[in-house]
Amino acid sequence: MSNPFNVVGINPCCVPSKSRADELAISQRMSVERRIVRAGSVDGMVKLDGGPFLMGTEDREGFPADGEGPVRETHVDPFYVDATPVTNAQFAEFVKATGFVTESERFGWSFVFQGHLDPERYKKLVEDTVLIVPWWCKVPGAKWDRPEGPDSSIASRMEMPVTQVSWNDAWAYAEWAGKRLPTEAEWEYAARGGLEQQTYPWGSELTPEGKH
């Protein structure tokens, strides 16, 4: 690897733009006593050989505004990536060690998928929705350890992937873990599962043989 950090497997949602200024701000906010764990370790990671692949899509399922097209040949160097997403337990360890405060905690709210809210909680908690995608609901108090709002909990979900994590939060976690976030090309290369120009890692059909 040309980069000294390994890639961490974290799945932020509603990803904001990033800048070096954001990165420096995060670094400054973190405790000077933070400890770097697993630095250089590849435990729980898989190595991908890299090489050329066709990146992007021109399929109608893609979003042109996200720059997903045109399809172009891209090359990635060999790299490691976490075999599984970062769990609530792992993120909790990071927060305990550093005192890190996520962006949703500082904002005081986050988006919650409508399907995760029963009708009663939807009526009680939701302040607003996104105009074009109304299934994303603005919920006050939603954060990584209260993912569906103040009355929710991750106590029974410690080994499930952490949610309500922004790009900046993920960047901070990766730095603490002695790793880094994947580039867009690395992420797409890994997510394609070795298949070329297929919609999903298993092919182009969402539910082959009725299974997803």
Regions found by a protein language model. Give the residues of each.
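Functional-site microenvironments in short loops/helix caps that host divalent-cation chemistry
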Residues: K18, A25, V42, K47-L48, ...
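Non-catalytic, well-ordered alpha-helical segments in soluble enzyme domains
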Residues: A97-T98
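Short amphipathic alpha-helices within nucleic acid-binding modules
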Residues: A92
